[in-house]
């Protein structure tokens, strides 16, 4: 068996075209969806991520504002900027790029973002809405993973899904979204004694721990759908995921590549959340 790849780049292009069309409709009502991105410090990776987000907004017809501050910015100053953006009617989504400098409490900053502008889906109000199945912003990476399943016509209902990782950003919300889709969900993590025992029974495996080759071919049920959220570097400095792609692709039914899988979907779902925030203004 040779797995079929779920092309995140192609799906992302399709969804961004939809975002652009819906944004054009909003502009006819005098509303341009607006995203504010705040970057504090000079983290090189964060600078790349932020540039990609701003470019994606521009390419899809969304308004974006990038506010880049020095690492010496105080927490009080950052909170004041977030509060000002909360009150700005031209801004429908606010994203504070993580990580923040160590003297700034990231949790406090995120909780200061107005829930109706929390397009990253990290606010406790968003997490609570997800938990109880109420409308709210879904964290972008898990949201993108669900869109990938949808794109191949895969219904998680009645399937056994294993999520490897329990972060607030990916693992936990991923498990909740799969539960909402009526999958039976197992969450595995660093204290799980026999990971393979669980993954071999899974129809869907989502790997999201940031560790190379955490999932190998002998750990995968034939025909399973494998979603690789990991972003790592191999011994040659080449981008790779959490999954041993070459081996697992011989066993799985579907698999997401790295790069070109989940990565582009994360930014696309950020655009989608920002668009949906603006659409709420026109009903």
Curated annotation (Swiss-Prot):
| InterPro entries, sorted | Aminoacid_DH-like_N_sf, NAD(P)-bd_dom_sf, THF_DH/CycHdrlase, THF_DH/CycHdrlase_cat_dom, THF_DH/CycHdrlase_CS, THF_DH/CycHdrlase_NAD-bd_dom
Q: How does it assemble?
A: Homodimer.
Q: Does the keyword Repeat apply?
A: no
Annotated catalysed reactions: (6R)-5,10-methylene-5,6,7,8-tetrahydrofolate + NADP(+) = (6R)-5,10-methenyltetrahydrofolate + NADPH; (6R)-5,10-methenyltetrahydrofolate + H2O = (6R)-10-formyltetrahydrofolate + H(+)
Detail which positions bind NADP(+): 165-167, 190
Q: What's an example Gene Ontology biological process for this entry?
A: tetrahydrofolate interconversion
Q: Name the pathway.
A: One-carbon metabolism; tetrahydrofolate interconversion
Q: Which NCBIfam families match?
A: PRK10792.1, PRK14186.1, PRK14189.1
Q: Which Gene3D superfamilies match?
A: Leucine Dehydrogenase, chain A, domain 1 (3.40.50.10860), NAD(P)-binding Rossmann-like Domain (3.40.50.720)
Q: Which UniProt keywords apply?
A: Amino-acid biosynthesis, Histidine biosynthesis, Hydrolase, Methionine biosynthesis, Multifunctional enzyme, NADP, One-carbon metabolism, Oxidoreductase, Purine biosynthesis
To which protein family does this belong? Belongs to the tetrahydrofolate dehydrogenase/cyclohydrolase family.
Q: Name one GO cellular component term.
A: cytosol
| Domain of life where this protein originates | Bacteria
List GO molecular-function terms, semicolon-separated. Answer: methenyltetrahydrofolate cyclohydrolase activity; methylenetetrahydrofolate dehydrogenase (NADP+) activity
Instruction: Tell me which EC number(s) this protein carries.
Output: 1.5.1.5, 3.5.4.9
Q: What does this protein do?
A: Catalyzes the oxidation of 5,10-methylenetetrahydrofolate to 5,10-methenyltetrahydrofolate and then the hydrolysis of 5,10-methenyltetrahydrofolate to 10-formyltetrahydrofolate.
Identify this protein by name: Bifunctional protein FolD
């Amino acid at each position: 068996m040779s797995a079929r790849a779920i092309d995140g780049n192609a799906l992302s292009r399709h969804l961004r075209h939809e975002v652009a069309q819906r944004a054009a409709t909003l502009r006819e009502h005098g509303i341009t969806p607006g995203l504010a991105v705040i970057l504090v410090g000079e983290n090189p990776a964060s600078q790349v991520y932020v540039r990609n987000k701003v470019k994606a907004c521009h390419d899809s017809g969304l308004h974006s504002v990038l506010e880049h501050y020095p690492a010496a910015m105080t927490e009080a100053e950052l909170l004041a900027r977030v509060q000002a953006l909360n009150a700005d009617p031209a801004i429908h989504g606010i994203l504070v790029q993580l990580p923040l400098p160590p003297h700034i409490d990231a949790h406090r900053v995120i909780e200061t973002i107005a829930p109706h502008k929390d397009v990253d889906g990290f606010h406790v109000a968003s997490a609570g809405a997800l938990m109880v199945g109420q409308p709210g912003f879904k964290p972008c990476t898990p949201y993108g993973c669900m869109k990938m399943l949808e794109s191949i016509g895969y219904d998680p209902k009645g399937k056994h899904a294993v999520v490897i990782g329990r972060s607030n950003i990916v693992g936990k919300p991923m498990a909740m979204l799969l539960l909402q889709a009526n999958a039976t969900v197992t969450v595995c993590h660093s204290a799980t004694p026999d990971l393979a025992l669980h993954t071999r029974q899974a129809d869907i495996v989502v790997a999201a721990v940031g560790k190379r080759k955490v999932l190998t071919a002998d750990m995968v049920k034939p025909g399973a759908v494998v979603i690789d959220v990991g972003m790592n570097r191999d011994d040659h400095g080449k981008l790779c995921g959490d999954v041993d792609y070459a081996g697992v692709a011989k066993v799985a039914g579907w698999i997401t590549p790295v790069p070109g899988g989940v990565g582009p979907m994360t930014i696309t779902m950020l655009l989608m959340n920002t668009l949906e925030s603006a659409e709420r203004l026109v009903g």
